[in-house]
Amino acid sequence: MPGGACVLVIALMFLAWGEAQECSPGGHQFLRSPYRSVRFDSWHLQQSAVQDLICDHSLSPGWYRFLILDRPAEMPTKCVEMNHCGTQAPIWLSLRDSETLPSPGEIKQLTACATWQFLFSTTKDCCLFQIPVSVRNCGNFSVYLLQPTQGCMGYCAEAISDARLHPCGSDETETGGDCVRQLAASLPPPPAGRPEVLVELIESRLFCRCSFDVPATKNSVGFHIAWSRLSSQEVKEELTQETTVQAFSLLELDGINLRLGDRIFCSASVFFLENPHVQSVAIESQEFFAGFKLQPELSTISEDGKEYYLRIESTVPIICSEFSELDQECKISLKLKTIGQGREHLGLNLALSSCHVDLLQTSSCANGTCSHTFVYYTAVTDFSRDGDRVSNIVVQPIVNEDFLWNNYIPDSIQIKVKDVPTAYCYTFTDPHIITFDGRVYDNFKTGTFVLYKSMSRDFEVHVRQWDCRSLHYPVSCNCGFVAQEGGDIVTFDMCNGQLRESQPYLFIKSQDVTRNIKISESYLGRKVTIWFSSGAFIRADLGEWGMSLTIRAPSVDYRNTLGLCGTFDENPENDFHDKNGMQIDQNFNNYVAFINEWRILPGKSMSDTLPVSMTSPGKPSYCSCSLDTAAYPSSEDLDSVSRSEIALGCKDLNHVSLSSLIPELDVTSEYINSDTLVREINKHTSPEEYNLNLFLQEKKHINLTKLGLNVQKHPGNEKEDSLQYLANKKYTQGRGSHSQEMRYNRQNRWKRQNFHEFPPLFAFPSLSQTDLEELTYFFPEDHAEDVQQEFFPSWPTPSGLTEYSTLTLCQETLANSSIGRLCLAFLGKRLDSVIEMCVKDVLLKDDLSWAEAGVALLENECEKRIVEEGKYNTEEYGTSIEDILSVLKCPNLCSGNGQCMEWGCACSPSFSSYDCSDSYDKAPEITELGNAGFCDVQKYNCMMVRVFGKGFKELPSIKCEVTKLQYNSSEWMPGEPIYTQTVFHNSRAVDCQLPTDVQQFDTMDLVGGKPTGKWQLKVSNDGYKFSNPKITVIYDGACQVCGLYKNDSCTIKENVCIIDGLCYVEGDKNPTSPCLICRPKISRFTWSFLENNQPPVIQALQDKLQTFYGENFEYQFVAFDPEGSDIHFTLDSGPEGASVSSAGLFMWKTDLLTTQQITVRLNDDCDAETRVTIEVTVKSCDCLNGGSCVSDRNFSPGSGVYLCVCLPGFHGSLCEVDISGCQSNPCGLGSYISGFHSYSCDCPPELKVETQFVNQFTTQTVVLTRSDKSVNKEEDDKNAQGRKRHVKPTSGNAFTICKYPCGKSRECVAPNICKCKPGYIGSNCQTALCDPDCKNHGKCIKPNICQCLPGHGGATCDEEHCNPPCQHGGTCLAGNLCTCPYGFVGPRCETMVCNRHCENGGQCLTPDICQCKPGWYGPTCSTALCDPVCLNGGSCNKPNTCLCPNGFFGEHCQNAFCHPPCKNGGHCMRNNVCVCREGYTGRRFQKSICDPTCMNGGKCVGPSTCSCPSGWSGKRCNTPICLQKCKNGGECIAPSICHCPSSWEGVRCQIPICNPKCLYGGRCIFPNVCSCRTEYSGVKCEKKIQIRRH
């Protein structure tokens, strides 16, 4: 070949080499920083702009090309001085021995070196660190395969000279530095167009086709085509060559020479047929991938719940064997798997919507795609701080009968999952709230609040807080919550009841079928957790006082939360925010404004109304699709994702962790898949039964009998299936008392706030689903006035508890608990904050039992920390993880009384409870009685006494021992004990029934004139070992005041009487003798006679009473008694036949025409008498023509007005008009017969009418005959009783016609003969006929229509009507009289008689109800009302006037009196009890105190001011001082003593530690980083090398 042609070919080959993948424009990245130049001195960067230093430790591995200000550059091959190339340690390319740079198109593996010079050293080390670098010569430039550096180092670049930037042209060759153009005769043909590789189907076989465009030329050309593929080592392997005159080539995809998954290339060169050795440069095609591609939407995702699609496509057609079954669809099935990189125990962090996809056969390929499908993937929300992780999605080997497809494994892809924080919020006990970001504050307010609201999705939690029994300070506790996620709404509530009595109930108000919700119980129901599909959960730790809540926020809510739990953005400073998310101004009480901001108005919370939520669209379920389920730990070993494999599609599994390290019992089905969606927790179900539930789950795996363990059954319990038992015991408390709470809300709610009242007991039925949907109740705390109460608690407490003793108890209870000791490394400072909460709880409530409430927080926090980080740091924590898991499963390690199983404690015989701490052999302990043991028989049913304590067990043998105490002389003596019925509520509360005569007053003993009944109570679980005794006092609140404020005794009230052992309030009358009354000022022990009794008073009578002869005269006397006594009427004198009823109704049948005098006597119950005489005038009855007189009801009785009732044929006011006159010849052809005021007609025989009565609503047929023709006429008669008449003329020629009209009441029946129409009679048919007859002198005006006289009504006038009508439910009687209901009198029952004497200006509304004036209440308005109520035991004497006990004064007895007065600003809290100002203590508060106390020998020199010894500082002298600052993360733990990390040592932690040690004189310059001497390298400098320097 001539030299010129050779040069041309080489030049064209350079072009081909430049087409390597890394040489292509998208195959590499650029490093353009001018600082990388070897000539750039980086000293000034270190002095002024450290952030601009070149540090390639975070450089992504890949191919790079260097540019300096857009000028081509390459790595230098000579040693570069330190502090050049924009960095401290520049990296250059070292060519050792005979190494050279790669020639064009070649790639070489070379070594790069970093230059470094140690401090105080005079020589530099050009190759202190070595990094492998691959170099590819792309012709005009070079690219480098670079790796990230170990530290802050930088790769150098050197600009290419101008001479090298302008090589000779493609048709030129370099000769002596000059470019000489070649001769035209030796030029090769122009190259072909870039080939393209495609797959096509030819006769059921797959072929790769390489085709290209042919350049235009004058000569005949041929083509040389070469096939190659890229090996797994990224090296091209030639497959075959072909010389052809066709512009394409075919190569079969046979699975042997060419397989699926190959990356295929073809190249084509052109040659002249006349001169075959002259060829063009070979042009290579783009890479063609034959097989399946997995193309993710994003390769880097976050744990934020978002979903992404994965496109799976095939670049080759899907074909099926001709021998395959005809009914099978032609497809290729792929099974997907996910493999997480890194340590196996991290668990999976990627989930797929399906582990199985199908690629179906298509008719053709388009845009390089022959078939495709989709599957969704998402990050697993694992609630772990596992950092950013990478997972592979791989495809299992394809199983197919076609050799081409069988065992083909498509390339996997990598998905990087970025970790997103999750957080927990705690609201415990008082409650103390710890926000998502860790800020701690107290919310002592009551009401309903927004606890947690997501701005990124439909999720919200409302919490209710009630007053929880602090005797001295206004504190609150959680009593329930409602949580909503989308369409799922769950309520867990115990607010509708009284403190320590109410039981929590849980129900699902709404459910979204597209989501999964889970409800679980742990520790025998002490923990209840609601899990939502997003991963959020709400856990309630139950107590008799309410519940503590733990809320978990998933990563999807990061930076998207509002409410009392804060903003969840890892910045606690902005947790106090308003409803718009804006931070509330910083001030001393900004938390108060923050709490008020999130308080919900009454009736607006989800507890009161069902929120409107849009049903979320259906989302795909996800599977783990893990590679090997056995390779991952089970749920007990902290795996957060289920390992079940779904064959076709994912159904129920989630991409969110819903597992717990604390053993749990899934009880979801009890609330979702049952007719009743509510079950009361811990009510009527003992812990033993819950334990039985757990055992039932494990019975098929564990033989508990062989272990000698107690399955905790009792006689009677094993008869029922435990779960069925729970299902049958579904009650709720509060429904039955709803109406009472609405009526007596003020008094009822004070029962919750005042511990000293005895709460009522009610029985409540089960609730239906309809009840649950409408279940709302009145929550008084929502309506209470929001008043910020400042209080200053101080030590010691009123009961004498000191701060030191309380702190010791809290530390022992919490820090020394099993969870506190074993999980200390994880709890850290959280343990200290929980101990502080414990101390504050005891201080505020003065009750040591609250010390245990914080253990639940430690359990939840420990579980959280282990889930977040513990299981990923097994090297650091060692075997302590296993110990912690054991104590989470088995609290207190089963107290040494049982064996720890996977599901919890299996207690030994005679022990029970979730931690086996309760012993059956141990007698229970009574701590107190309901309402401190006092019960007022006037207010409550004292038959049942609520007993609070510890160790109660629901056993058939549980019983109460009740002993009546008899007062003998000066002491109480016990009587015979009685064993009574016991109602078990839970392990801390039972009800004891007292004997049936407990409320009979004759059972009370007079103690100095004070009637009191005392009973001693004991409780036993087994009937043998009884608890300590407690005394309950039954008293009559009408006469006595009992309670704590009366020094545990009772005192008799003023203004009461004690008569015959019974108690009466002043003004009470003798039940059998109304004239005897209680007058304590006259006699407290006998009845007093009702003095100054006034006689009854008759109300004003009518001026004149009249009646008429023959009237049944009735008149009602009305009177009242000033004292409210009953009145009795008697007739003293009057006419014969007259009488008066005891109620005052006078009756007389008037049979005389003379005026009569009547005398009536009125007597009250005390025989006071009043006489009244009335005169009645009798008028005559002036009705004529036999008419009779009746009373006119339009006038009141006694007016004497009457009406006349006339006989037929007469009318007029006095019946004076005769209406019986006849018309001329009224009978026509018949003969006229006259009668008394009437007439009749005697018809000829031929016109006589046969009358037959028929039933009502029949058809009346009249047959008329004329000219031998019969005509039938039918008519309906529905208004009267029909008659069927047959008029039978004797002659067929007769024609009937009436000359004169018959009138409206008659009809023509024969020639000139009219007869009465049906329903009418009389000579002129003027009298209508009514059947039945009209009563009470009613008049028949139309057939069967009566016109009634005044005072009567109805169809036949048989109903009495009174005018005016009777009032107040009175019944009308004959004679326009009213009979009145109880409590009303008068002619129209218009006067009410009040049976109660309404006092203090009250008015009688109904006979038994008084309407009181403001400030008074009670049945007779005798009790004054003080608002606000009298405090500190004060009694309400008059409206808003309190009578204070000794030691208190003020309008509401709110001020205490201390003598001597409190010093130094101390506050008088109650009688002679001072509360010290902060910083002082002592009897006179003369001592200053430091709280917390000074540490490390510091002295308290002022309130909370410490004087620290040398070497210590800080407010508490708790901060050590190191004069020489600790370096490299060391911590100053004592004066001038540093605690160093494991990789540093020395006084100031300034000396690094290399393990293993550096060899051959190497020096340790960083932890585990050696600086080797010249000619040595390696991690430990263990390798000896030769360095060639240039």
Swiss-Prot record:
Q: Where is this region: Disordered?
A: 1268-1288
Entry keywords, A to Z: Disulfide bond, EGF-like domain, Glycoprotein, Repeat, Secreted, Signal
Q: Which residues form the EGF-like domain?
A: 1177-1216, 1294-1326, 1358-1390, 1422-1454, 1455-1486, 1518-1550, 1551-1582
Residues in domain VWFD?
A: 423-606
Disulphide connectivity of cysteines:
425-565, 468-477, 1181-1189, 1183-1204, 1206-1215, 1298-1308, 1302-1314, 1316-1325, 1362-1372, 1366-1378, 1380-1389, 1426-1436, 1430-1442, 1444-1453, 1458-1468, 1462-1474, 1522-1532, 1526-1538, 1540-1549, 1554-1564, 1558-1570, 1572-1581
A GO CC annotation recorded here is: extracellular region
The source's superkingdom equals: Eukaryota
Q: Which PROSITE patterns match?
A: EGF_1 (PS00022), EGF_2 (PS01186), EGF_3 (PS50026), VWFD (PS51233)
Q: Does the keyword tRNA-binding apply?
A: no
What's a single GO MF annotation on this record?
Answer: signaling receptor binding
Q: What is its main location?
A: secreted
- Specify the signal sequence span: 1-20
Point out the glycosylated residues in this chain.
367, 703, 968
InterPro entries assigned to the protein according to its UniProt record, in alphabetical order = Dev_Signal_Modulators, EGF-like_dom, VWF_type-D
- Basic and acidic residues bias located where? 1268-1280
Where is this protein localized, as stated in its record?
Secreted
Protein name as it appears in the record: von Willebrand factor D and EGF domain-containing protein
Q: Which organism is it from?
A: Homo sapiens (Human)
